[in-house]
């Protein structure tokens, strides 16, 4: 156990060194990311969006405290990346123990970190700002409801033909949850494309849903 504490926003954060998967982040008892296979998650996540729209001018990341999605956006040459993260302590602890994942994404000129409630923060963003929005929230019903409640706000800041992509959990373990996410996307966009990848540290396939703003 490398870290074990409760953050100021009330999340139970642990960094454990796992024999098979290296340093790994747990939040509230659930694994979020492991050093050895994080690239599978982030590359599939960002790739799912870019498969529907190649434009890489401007991206928003909502959540994603380990920095993997931000790093992947940098590697895909996005010019501007706004990273909205509630819990700066997650980012700090990941920079400290899982440094290779974020590769100091917070220090890159193309990345602007906005701390606090993302859905409050995006209220000040102009219409039609982003080519891509990546929603990397926890995979539970609370976050599905939160995203659904704020979907109109996200659509407002998404360019025409822009793409929103979310990690939606595992059809292997929680199929109803994935269906609930897909229902939200289909309701708001009329389209949803599911991508999946097997992640060994999660011991299951993981799903990402993308929708185009027609």
Give the positions of each predicted feature:
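The AdoMet/dcAdoMet-binding core of the Class I SAM-like
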Residues: 21, 33-183, 188, 202-204
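N-terminal auxiliary segments of SAM/dcSAM-dependent transferases
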Residues: 1-24
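Short strand-turn-strand beta-turns centered on an Asx-Gly dipeptide
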Residues: 28-29
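Conserved S-adenosyl-L-methionine
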Residues: 189-200
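Short, isolated positions in well-ordered beta-strands
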Residues: 13, 32-33
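Short, well-ordered helical secondary-structure segments
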Residues: 2, 12-14, 100, 109, ...
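Core SAM-dependent methyltransferase catalytic element
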Residues: 200-214
């Amino acid at each position: 156990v490398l870290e074990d504490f409760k953050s100021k926003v009330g999340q139970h954060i642990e960094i454990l060194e796992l024999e098979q998967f290296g340093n790994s982040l747990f939040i509230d008892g659930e694994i979020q990311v492991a050093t050895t296979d994080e690239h599978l998650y982030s590359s599939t996540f960002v790739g799912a969006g870019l498969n529907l729209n190649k434009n890489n001018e401007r991206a928003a990341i909502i959540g994603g405290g380990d920095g993997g999605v931000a790093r992947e956006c940098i590697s895909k040459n996005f010019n501007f990346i706004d990273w909205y993260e509630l819990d700066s302590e997650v980012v700090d602890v990941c920079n400290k123990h899982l440094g290779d994942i974020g590769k100091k994404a917070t220090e890159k000129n193309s990345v602007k970190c906005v701390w606090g409630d993302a859905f409050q923060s995006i209220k000040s963003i102009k219409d039609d700002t982003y080519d891509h929005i990546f929603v990397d929230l926890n995979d539970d019903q609370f976050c599905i409801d939160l995203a659904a409640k704020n979907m109109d706000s996200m659509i407002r800041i998404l360019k025409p033909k822009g793409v929103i992509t979310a990690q939606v959990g595992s059809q292997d373990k929680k199929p109803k949850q994935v269906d609930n996410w897909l229902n939200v996307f289909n309701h708001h966009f009329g389209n949803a494309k599911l991508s999946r990848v097997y992640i060994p540290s999660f011991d299951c396939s993981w799903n990402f849903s993308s929708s185009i703003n027609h």
